[in-house]
Amino acid sequence: MTKRVFIAHGWDGYPEEGWFPWLKKELEARGFEVFVPQLPNAGNPRIQIWVPSIAEAVGTADEQTYFVGHSMGCQAVARYLETLPEGVKVGGAVFVAGFFKRLAGLEDAPDVQETDKHWLGTPIDLAKVKSHLPKSVAIFSDDDPWVPLDNQDDFRDKLGSEIIIEHAKGHFSGGRDKITELPVARDKVLSLAG
């Protein structure tokens, strides 16, 4: 059976952003089916809209199903995994610039603050997420302006993720940080799927 990878963009993201097209092409060249769905209303993301959108894109999840999340896409993937029926396991996930604990440096605009509170204030059962996720990797940058490094704690301690800290990659964004290739993400997907 073909291994499938679903890439979830972040807040204000889109499928052609940054390193997503490169990663899609790299993994397809190695025999994976890769999907990068446009999550609805990316400028004002909502859990109750994004999670069902991921579920619809995935269909039936199994051990041949892998995920890559970027920023808020990591939360969306984890919250999707939380909804899976008991006993269902996926192959693994690579989280890039993910967070459960806190964000930093956000604008004071009310809509930005409200979106931040929506995602960080809505409880998530990471033990349930872990029950569906046997293997994961969480990648951070030492100079991310929005995702402080203490976010790694939940990934390591509650999800059992391997932690990787990259140097000077910012938020791993295409526009702001000019990241159009991310070999560490490709390599970790290949390792998880190995």
Regions found by a protein language model. Name each.
Residues T2-E63:
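Active-site catalytic motif of lipid deacylating hydrolases and related acyltransferases
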Residues G10, L39-A42, A93-L103:
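Active-site nucleophile loop of the alpha/beta-hydrolase fold
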Residues P45, K169-L182:
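Catalytic histidine-centered segment of alpha/beta-hydrolase-like enzymes
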Residues F67-V77:
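Gly/Ala-rich beta-loop-alpha elbow adjacent to hydrolase catalytic centers
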Residues H132-L133, V137-F140, D144:
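Short beta-strand/loop motif that positions the catalytic acidic residue
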